A protein has these predicted regions:
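Accessory "access/gating" subregions that flank catalytic or transport cores
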Residues: 1-9, 18-27, 37-42, 56-172
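Hydrophobic, membrane-interfacing alpha helices
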Residues: 12, 48-50
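Long, well-ordered alpha-helical segments
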Residues: 25-34, 190
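Short sequence/structural elements of tandem HEAT/ARM alpha-solenoid repeats
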Residues: 30-35, 72-73, 197-201
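Catalytic phosphate/nucleotide-handling subdomain of diverse soluble enzymes
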Residues: 44-47, 54-56, 60, 149-212
Length: 212
């Protein structure tokens, strides 16, 4: 994952396989980060590494009594705690603060999404250059822009399972990944029986996958 050897060191890959370490370490994010350190560093450095750690911390903190605290309040508390892993000067930290400010301003999520696109994909602010560095798809698989998009769905979804994954899917870029990240996290928080009630139908207990 060294930037000198791997031009893809800030793509989204690491978060897809390391979030689960947070669930392996209930309420102990420090140990979760220790367990996940090597798996992250096989493919990610710098912002992609910090973003992966953000998601791991979120998952580690997802153990709580839903009768004692509202899911929305807990989600925001978890996010604020995970924000501390992002160096303040990094573009990932600035993306977090930018999206949170948009949410707090009351603008619709669609407007926040367009503002994110303009600031980072078009204007390339905060030293975010993947939209031009990656000529294959303007950085559509980059950890950064997908992190920003995932925060839009996290904040505007406000802990609502369906709304969160809807917004995540509609934000674009590599949108199946933020949707699966928050779908997995909220699914764990709500539990299987509650998810079944949300969709009011029998859920499959098997999943078949193949590679072409």
């Amino acid at each position: 994952s060294s930037p000198n050897l791997n031009p893809h060191y800030e793509m989204i890959d690491a978060q897809l396989t390391t979030e689960i370490f947070g669930l392996y370490s209930p309420l102990n994010p420090e140990y979760a980060l220790l367990m996940s350190s090597l798996p992250i560093r096989t493919v990610a450095r710098e912002n992609a590494e910090w973003i992966s750690q953000f998601y791991i911390i979120m998952h580690s903190l997802s153990y709580f009594d839903k009768d004692e605290i509202q899911i929305k309040d807990k989600i925001f508390s978890m996010a604020n705690e995970a924000r501390k892993i992002l160096p303040d000067a990094s573009y990932s930290a600035k993306m977090y603060d930018f999206v949170k400010e948009k949410y707090q301003s009351g603008v619709p999520w669609e407007a926040a999404r367009d503002s994110l696109h303009k600031r980072y994909q078009i204007s390339q602010e905060d030293n975010y250059f993947w939209s031009t560095k990656d000529e294959s798809c303007n950085g559509c698989f980059a950890a950064g822009i997908n992190f920003g998009a995932s925060l839009i769905s996290l904040f505007y979804g406000e802990g609502d399972f369906k709304e969160t994954i809807k917004i995540a899917s509609l934000c674009g870029w590599d949108s199946d990944n933020p949707a699966s990240t928050w779908g997995g996290l909220l699914g764990f928080i709500y539990g299987k029986e509650e998810i079944k009630k949300l969709f009011n139908e029998q859920m499959s207990d098997t999943y078949n996958i193949h590679r072409t």
